[in-house]
Amino acid sequence: MKVLLIGDYSNLHACLAAELRRRGIDVTLVSDGGAYMNTDHDIYLSRTPGIQGAFHYLRDVYELSNSLTGYDVVQLVNPGFAHLRPEKLKFFLDRFRKRNGGLFLTLAGDDYYFVKACNDGVFKFSEYKIGDRLTELGKTEEFTGWLRDDVRKYTEYLYGILDGAMSALPEYDIAARPVLGDKLKYCGIPIDLEQLKYAEFDNSDERVNLFLGMKEEYSLRKGTGILQKILQELVDEMPDRCRLIKVSNISIQEYYDKMRAAHIVTPAAPARTTARS
């Protein structure tokens, strides 16, 4: 079997690809490596700023839609699997679908249906709304952009032609279930345990190492700024009993190396489900 994974989200598809390969499946992963995260990928696809960067990116996606053919499965990491407007995404979606087998979707990150569920009060609270009150993120163009008519039409089209989908978090599952029904399976977040080998701690210091991993651009969304403040207060109160290891915007391998020294890992603030806590 040949599987084509297009796009990645915080190493999710890279971990999935690693396990599929261990099971003898031929996998090709196209992504930008998560930018500074530098996650595994087979084909590097990234958009640089400016008009020239846009033209080069459009050319690269077009060439990939010509060359990546004959796969049994094409799985997109999100409806926005490339950094393009909805009408261009639909064009390339149709090309990949025509030249390959089944079309599948990973529900990871925001899309029209998830943001609509947040806006419609499906969740008691979300990064966009708490009850009827908009949060800081809910007052941004990012929030309203997901609800634009062209985004809605494109997402409805994509969901309508899918052969199946997997949800990475329960909230994504809740938002998409009314539309996809039995085509949707909750799979959770793939984790490549080969990258997380057991390691002995050096406990000679006797202090507890508190680890906080951050993406600076997602600090507001994930609440890591709040966590940092709380953890720092704890360290200031008991400097002889604990220390804070904070990392931000580093490669995934550096992240793993730093995390191995941690006794307690706090990657993000609790959200609607335990999956994000």
Predicted regions and their residues:
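A conserved mid-protein helix/loop that constitutes part of the nucleotide-sugar donor-binding site
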Residues: 11-15, 218-233
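A short, active-site helix/loop in glycosyltransferases that binds the activated sugar's phosphate group
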Residues: 114-115, 142-184, 229, 233
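N-terminal subdomain of nucleotide-sugar transferases
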Residues: 1-43, 98-101
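Conserved donor-binding/catalytic core segment of Leloir-type glycosyltransferases
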Residues: 185-222, 228
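Acceptor-binding helix/loop patch of EC 2.4 sugar-transfer enzymes
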Residues: 39-42, 105-149
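Acidic donor-binding loop of glycosyltransferase active sites
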Residues: 260-273
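Short N-terminal targeting/anchoring amphipathic segment
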Residues: 2-6, 65-88, 102-106, 266-267
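Membrane-proximal helix-turn-helix segments that form the acceptor-binding/catalytic region
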Residues: 62, 68, 91-98, 128-164
